[in-house]
């Protein structure tokens, strides 16, 4: 796959709609051509300790951040027509669906590819398949 958008969401709590940051890398012709990162004010706007332990973000980091609908207006043109790649696709796809539903925005049927699933198949000898290990 030569053209794709790698996408990663982080959440403030265990609600998929509570996205507090998004990172995207655009790849065309096998080369990184663009990237995007934004903090997002989550909905609902509270942080669970376990989530903060994963990504290090707190409410203080996102209190002044834009809401998802504002950030999505910047993201949508970047990823238009590209398949999306994520590590543990059910999580990231679920976050995207939940946020779009929360803000009453249309969900296009984005094509997702899962690097976690691929890593488990291709690298079965690894002790785990977390992103930092792979």
Which stretches of residues belong to each language-model region?
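Conserved non-catalytic scaffold segment of RNase H-like nuclease domains
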Residues: 1-110, 124-134
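A generic structural signal for short hydrophobic patches within well-formed alpha-helices
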Residues: 96, 118-119
């Amino acid at each position: 796959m030569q053209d794709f958008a790698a996408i990663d969401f982080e959440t403030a709590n265990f609600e998929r709609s509570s996205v507090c940051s998004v990172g995207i890398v655009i790849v065309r012709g096998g080369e990184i051509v663009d990237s995007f990162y934004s903090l997002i004010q989550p909905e609902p706007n509270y942080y669970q300790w376990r989530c903060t332990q994963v990504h290090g973000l707190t409410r203080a980091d996102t209190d002044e951040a834009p809401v998802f609908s504002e950030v999505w207006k910047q993201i949508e043109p970047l990823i238009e027509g590209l398949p999306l790649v994520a590590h543990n696709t059910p999580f990231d796809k679920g976050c995207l669906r939940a946020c779009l539903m929360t803000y009453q925005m249309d969900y296009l049927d984005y094509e997702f590819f899962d690097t976690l699933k691929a890593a488990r198949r291709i690298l079965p000898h690894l002790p785990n398949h977390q992103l930092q290990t792979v």
